[in-house]
Amino acid sequence: MGTTTMGVKLDDATRERIKSAASRIDRTPHWLIKQAIFNYLEKLENDETLPELPALLSGAANESDDASEPTEEPYQPFLEFAEQILPQSVRRAAITAAWRRPETDAVPMLLEQARLPQPLGEQAHKLAYQLAEKLRNQKTASGRAGMVQSLLQEFSLSSQEGVALMCLAEALLRIPDKATRDALIRDKISNGNWQSHIGRSPSLFVNAATWGLLFTGKLVSTHNETSLSRSLNRIIGKSGEPLIRKGVDMAMRLMGEQFVTGETIAEALANARKLEEKGFRYSYDMLGEAALTAADAQAYMVSYQQAIHAIGKASNGRGIYEGPGISIKLSALHPRYSRAQYDRVMEELYPRLKSLTLLARQYDIGINIDAEEADRLEISLDLLEKLCFEPELAGWNGIGFVIQAYQKRCPFVIDYLIDLATRSRRRLMIRLVKGAYWDSEIKRAQMEGLEGYPVYTRKVYTDVSYLACAKKLLAVPNLIYPQFATHNAHTLAAIYQLAGQNYYPGQYEFQCLHGMGEPLYEQVVGKVADGKLNRPCRIYAPVGTHETLLAYLVRRLLENGANTSFVNRIADNTLPLDELVADPVSAVEKLAQQEGQAGLPHPKIPLPRDLYGSGRSNSAGLDLANEHRLASLSSSLLNSALHKWQALPMLEQPVAEGEMQPVVNPAEPKDIVGYVREASDAEVQQALTSAINNAPIWFATPPQERAAILERAAVLMESQMPTLMGILVREAGKTFSNAIAEVREAVDFLHYYAGQVRDDFDNETHRPLGPVVCISPWNFPLAIFTGQIAAALAAGNSVLAKPAEQTPLIAAQGVAILLEAGVPPGVIQLLPGRGETVGAALTSDERVRGVMFTGSTEVATLLQRNIASRLDPQGRPTPLIAETGGMNAMIVDSSALTEQVVIDVLASAFDSAGQRCSALRVLCLQEEVADHTLTMLRGAMSECRMGNPGRLTTDIGPVIDAEAKENIERHIQAMRAKGRTVYQAVRENSEDAREWRHGTFVPPTLIELDSFDELKKEVFGPVLHVVRYNRNELDKLVEQINASGYGLTLGVHTRIDETIAQVTGSAKVGNLYVNRNMVGAVVGVQPFGGEGLSGTGPKAGGPLYLYRLLSSRPQDAVGVTFARQDAERPLDAQLKTLLEKPLQALQQWAAGRPELQALCQQYSEQAQSGTQRLLPGPTGERNTLTLMPRERVLCVADNEQDALIQLAAVLAVGCEVLWPDSALQRDLAKKLPREVSERIRFAKAEQLPVQAFDAVIYHGDSDQLRELCEQVAARDGAIVSVQGFARGETNLLLERLYIERSLSVNTAAAGA
C-alpha cells in the first residue's frame, strides 16, 4: 500500500495544543492528527452535515495550499513506529476494546440478547429433542462414516489409545521412509491398553480394529511377554511389519476419506452430487497449512484459481445461494499475514484476494473468507472493507466472511459488518461458527501474559454467544445473508424458530462439516411432506490429499472427540436427551446461581496473570496486534526517546558526572541513546567498603520484607515496561517482541525469588555469603542482570553489579527501579566499565564472597582461576555461578511436521539475531526429509525483514557491535573458503538496505556441514549450521553432540515417543525441548542453565539457585522447598529407588557403626536425585525438572571416618566415587560390600589433572584445600566446583552433586 507524507505548517501554539491533547489521552500527536483526518473524512463521505463547512468554504477560496514538500529531518527514534499506528472508526475501536474483556462483563449482556421468548423457547426445545432422538435412534451410519464414527467414539481423546490413534493419523501418511513409519506404528500401538476396548462397542468394525490393534500391539511390543505374542511372531515372522503398516495405513486413509470430500476438486465435485440431489449445497475448502514461503502462497493461489474455475463451471448459473461456493484461508495466500506486516499484506495479499473475488464474481459463486486466529481478525476486516468498496464488485452479494462466536468481540464485529454492508450498499454472506482454535488461543494468552482471553473459557458461554449473534444477523435480512454453521441440535432448533415460519429462498442457510454433520441435517434438508424441515444446508467440504489433511484432521478430532461437543455426546447413550438439548441460557443462569455471579470463568482455566497459582503472579505482556496497545506504546516510546539516558556509577553516595562516553544504537549510528562513565578505581574501592558495611543491615532485614521490596520492584518494572522497551530497542538492538519478553523475564525473576525466600527462608538459619559481584551479559542486559541481582538480594547478600560495557543504560534503569522499591543504596551498587578494568578489580578483591557471571566459557574459566585460592572465614571456597554458551543442536526426524519445524528453527536460530545462549547452532536433519525441509527453510528466511528494530515490521535486528559482526563474518568466510555451501537470505527492501550499510547487521545464514564435529566453537549470531544424519545413526549423532563438551539446550522434533526417550535419555544437556522452539526459557517453568562447558549450575529460575548464595542453612532446607512444591504437584521418584541400592548396601554393612548408619539414613532422606517434578506452565505444554546425579565425584580425605562420610553422601545421590589411589582408600575399599565397591574408581595423584570428574568433596586443612582448588581450576574443560569441610563435618551439600535437567514438551503437537 503506497504512502505519502503531506506536510502541514502549524504555528507553535497549535503544535503545543496538539501535543498536550495527545498526551492527555496517552497517544502521539501523529495518531491524533491521523485520527482527526480519518474521522472528518468519514463524516464527509457519509454526507453528514458539518455546521462549520459553509463558513469555512466561503472564506477558503483565497487561501493558498500550504502543503509543503517533505524535507530531510534529523533521525527521530520511533517516528516510523508512530506512523504505522492505524486510525479507527468508533465501531472498529469498539471491536478492539472488547478483545479480552472479562467474561463477567460480557456474559450478562449476552444472556439478555440470547434469551428466547417463552413460547419460542419451548418450541425450540421440543424440536431439538425430536432431532436428537431421531439422530440417536438412527441405525449407526452405514459404511465408512459409521465405522469411523464408532472408532472415534470408542477411542475418545481421554484415553491413551485415542491419543495414540490421533498421533498416528496426524503423522503416518506424510512420512517418506518405511523405517520411520514402522517405528511410529510400533511406538503408538505397543503401549496401548487395547484389551479394555474389546467388546465394548456394538460395531463389528471397532471390535475387529481393536482385535487387530491388540494383535498388532502384542506383535510390535518390544517385550514379548506372552506366549500369544511369541506364537504370532513365529507365524508372521519377518512379513509382520509390512502387513501391519498396510493395515494401519488403510485405517488412516479411511479416517482421511471420512473428513475429506475428495483428493482433487474434480473428485470432490463428483462425490458431492449424491447429497446435492437430496438438496444439500457445498462450500469447498482447499486444505493446507498457512503459507511460510512465497512459493507456498503462489501454489495456494493457483489451487484456489483452479478450484473457482471448476466450481464455477459446475455451478452452471445456479447463483450464490443455490449453487456451490468456495472458502479461502488468507494465511495460505501470504507468508506474512499479520498485523506487524500490515503494509505488505495490503500491498501483496489484497490484490490476490481481489483477483480471486473477481473470478468468483465472473461465475457468480459465493466466496467466503475463513476465520483464523484472533490476532488476525482485525487485519482481515481491513481487507474486507477495502474489497467491499471495489467498483468492479459493486452490487454483487457473493462476498462472504466468517465470524467466531467463541470470541468476545463477535457481537461488535457484527455491528461493524452491518454498518459495512450499509455503507457499501450490498448484502454480505456471514457464516457464524463457534470457533476451532480454542486451545491455541488459551495457550497464546497464557504464554504472552495477556490481560485475559479473546475467547470464552466455558463452552456454554460460546453457545449463548452464538444465539445472541444469530439474533443480530437475522434482524437485518436486507444486509446480511446468515449462514449458521452448527452441529448442535438445540442451536439448530433455536435458529429455526427465531427465523420464523415464513421462510423464503435466500433468507438464510445452515452449514455443517463434511463427515460430521450430515446425519443431523438429513432431517432438515428436504420437503415438509417428507417429514423434513425444508431448510437449506451447505456442507463445508475440505479438498486435498491425505498428506495435507493433518492439521485439519487433528482439529476435527479434537473438536469431535472433546467430551463437551454435541457430536461426541449424542453418541453417548448414558446421557439423557433433555440434558443434551438443554437451553444454554438456562444453563448459564443455573451456574450463576451456584457460583453467585454470572459469567465467572472456568475454575480450571486461570487467567494468564494467575497461571502459577497463589505463589506468584505471571508477568504481564503486551499484545502487539492490538491497535489500542500499539497507540499507547507509541506515545511512551516517543517520550522515552526525548530523554537523555545516563549510566554513572551508582554508589551509596552520589558521584560526580566526569567524562562521559556516548552509547550508540547498533542499528543506527546517528542515534545517541545516552552517555556512560566508567567507574574509577577509587569508586570500586568505595563500593566494596560500602558493600561490606551494608551487608549486615540487609541480612538483618527479615526475608518477608526483602521479598516485599523485590515484589515492589517487579510492579514498578512492569509499569515502566514501555520506557524500558525503548532503551532495549535502541541500546541492545532488540525487536519489540524481544524487548517485551526481556522485561517480562526480569519481572518473573523478581517474583520467583521473592516467593521462595518469603516461603522458605529464616534469618536465624539461612545465612548469606556477604558481598556478591554480578557480571551480566549484553544479550539479556535487563533480564539476566535483574535475575542475578534479585537472587543475591533475596538470599540476603549485598550486590556489586557490573553490567556489560555495551549495555550500561538499561542496567542503570534497572538499579534505579530497585532503589525506588526500597533496596538501600549501599546494598545494591552499579559499577559500569570494562571487564578487564572494573570486572577484574571487583573479582580479585579478597572481600568478595561470591561471583555470578554470564558470558563466554573462556572468561568464566579465568574468573574461576582468579578466585580459586580464596576461602571465606569458615574456610569454604568462594562460589562462582557461571552460565556460559553452547553448541546447541536440534534433531529432526522424518515424522516431524515440516511447517512446524521451519517455524521453530527460524525462532530458535535467528530471533534476537541469534544472540541467545540457547540459540540453535546446528540443525540435524534425517536424510529423507533434509532437502524438503531446507527448501522450505530457505523460502521462509527470504520472507524475514532485517533492519532497525524500532519498526514493528522488523524480524531481525543488528548484532551488538562491529566486533561481533566482524567475528561472525570471518567465520562465514572461513566456511566458504572450505567449500561449504553458504546460503544467506533476507527480504529485499530498499529502505532496510540503506540501514544495513550503517548498522551492524548480519543476514540470516545457513551453512551445510559434513558432520557435527566440524564445528569447533560457538558462533554467536544468526548463523545456522546443518548436518544430515542417517536414521540408524541417531545414537552416534547424540554422542557427537555430547562430545562437544557443551550441554546447554537441545531440541527434538519427532512424533515417536521412543525417539524422544532415546534422545532425552542420552543427551547431556541442561534444557531439552520437544516439538517446539528451544529459546525463551520461562522462569520457574523451564529453569535455565547448562552443564559441562555450558555452566556450573544451579539453574537460574530454579529451586536450587538461592541455596548457592548462602554460607549456611539447615540440613533439610532444600527438602523443605521441594516439599512445599510437591504438595501442589505430583512427584515421580521411581529412579531414586534404583539409584540408592549401593547406599542401602553401605547402610547394612555399617551395622556396627551407628553414626555412619544414621548418616546414611539422613542423606537418603535428603537426597533428591532421581526425582522428576512437574512444573506449572501454560496449557498445551508439559514441563518437568529432573534431578540427576553428577557422573563422578572426586572425594579427598585423610582418614577413614571422613572417607565414609563422603562415600555415604555421594552414594545417596547416585554418583560414582573417584578416590586417590592411596593405602587408606585401597584398604577401605576391600572391606566394603560389592555393590558399593563397584561404584568406586581409583586414580593416582599424577593422573588426577586428566581424570574425568565433575565435583569435588574435601575434608581437611584449609591450606591443602586452597591448593586443591587451584589444581582443579587449572584443569582444561568444564569448571568443577569444590566443597571443602573441616575433618568430621557431616553437613555436606548434596544439591551440589545434582545435575538439573529441564524438559519442555509441546503436547499440542499432534494433539497429544
Swiss-Prot record:
Protein family:
In the N-terminal section; belongs to the proline dehydrogenase family.
Matching NCBIfam families: D1pyr5carbox3 (TIGR01238), PRK11809.1 (NF008772), PRK11904.1 (NF008869)
Q: What does this protein do?
A: Oxidizes proline to glutamate for use as a carbon and nitrogen source and also function as a transcriptional repressor of the put operon.
Protein name per its UniProtKB record: Bifunctional protein PutA
One GO cellular component term of this record is:
cytoplasmic side of plasma membrane
Q: Lineage from the top down?
A: Bacteria, Pseudomonadati, Pseudomonadota, Gammaproteobacteria, Enterobacterales
Q: List required co-factors.
A: FAD
Spans annotated as Aldehyde dehydrogenase: 653-1119
Instruction: Map out region (Proline dehydrogenase) in residue numbers.
Output: 228-574
Location of the active site:
E883, C917
**Coiled coil stretches, renumbered:** none
Q: Per the record, what are the reactions this protein catalyses? A: L-proline + a quinone = (S)-1-pyrroline-5-carboxylate + a quinol + H(+); L-glutamate 5-semialdehyde + NAD(+) + H2O = L-glutamate + NADH + 2 H(+)
Q: Which GO terms describe its biological process?
A: proline biosynthetic process; proline catabolic process to glutamate
